[in-house]
Amino acid sequence: MSSSTWISIDFDDYRHLPKYSGHPTRSNKQHITSANKELSEDFLKGMTGLENWLNSNDYPVTFFIIADLFDNTTFSNWFQLIINQFPQRITIGNHGLNHRSWSAWPEDVEGFNDALVESNKILQQYCGDNLRPWFRAPAGYIAPWMAPVLAKNGFKVDSSVNPSWLVKRKAGKANTWSKVEQSMKDNKIVEISWKTKWSLPINGPALHIPILKTIANGTWKSSPVVDSLDNSLKINGQITALYWHLLDHSRKQSTWSPPLP
């Protein structure tokens, strides 16, 4: 069986993190819809760093974008420049309307559906032919009840599952990652879970956490060749999913780059 690596970048600013908004217990009191929509200094630096990185290689990459970022003119204008510069390399996935941690709250089919409809509408407007029916739950909070709603809204791929025991709570109360994966399968959605090592996370924040960082770097560098998800899905081979955050590109004075093979 052929194998490939799919790389993606989550477009989260600090205001989107569960620490600040969207989570019933982890967030401060600021309501998610009233959060300041201005881009943080590090996010702006990350935009510069990402552009530098894109100019340094020819990897195909997926951006998982939170739709409310397009409320910001600076981001919208920059995004259009990037898409115009790299139209064949970039695909876009849905990372939610405003980064609500859905599975941490009581089941809300109607609210989730409304958020998908609105976020899809916004992304279709700005992303055009680069948009794909791919979803990544904000902060990886995904529960089985969300799969039928994703299917109803035309999604074909989900990449929300981080199959590590350290974050199993994100599947929702009394749920497991296997239940999430089965629900996706039952609803004819391809689940592409994140790569782990020894059941430890190696994506996203793990790239910068002591010990996990060392494990992640070695695993990433030994991963299969990078290919677009469009191609990998056609081949129906084994897919290794690796991802990081746009904010990572603000590190090292906007010169940080992921430890890709």
Predicted regions and their residues:
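Active-site-adjacent pocket scaffolds in enzyme catalytic domains
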Residues: 129, 136-241
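Active-site flanking residues adjacent to catalytic metal/cofactor-binding acidic residues
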Residues: 7-9, 94, 157, 244
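Active-site and substrate-binding clefts of carbohydrate-active enzymes
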Residues: 237-261
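Metal-dependent polysaccharide deacetylase catalytic core of the NodB/CE4 family, i.e.
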Residues: 59-144, 167, 187, 196, ...
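Histidine/acidic-residue-rich catalytic or RNA/ligand-binding cores of hydrolases
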Residues: 103, 169-174, 251-260
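Surface-exposed, active-site-proximal loop segments in enzymatic domains
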Residues: 21-31, 98-110, 205-210, 257
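Non-membrane alpha-helical structural segments and their capping/turn regions in soluble enzymes
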Residues: 40-44, 109-117, 219-223
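Active-site beta->alpha N-cap acidic-glycine motif
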Residues: 1-83, 132, 249, 255-257
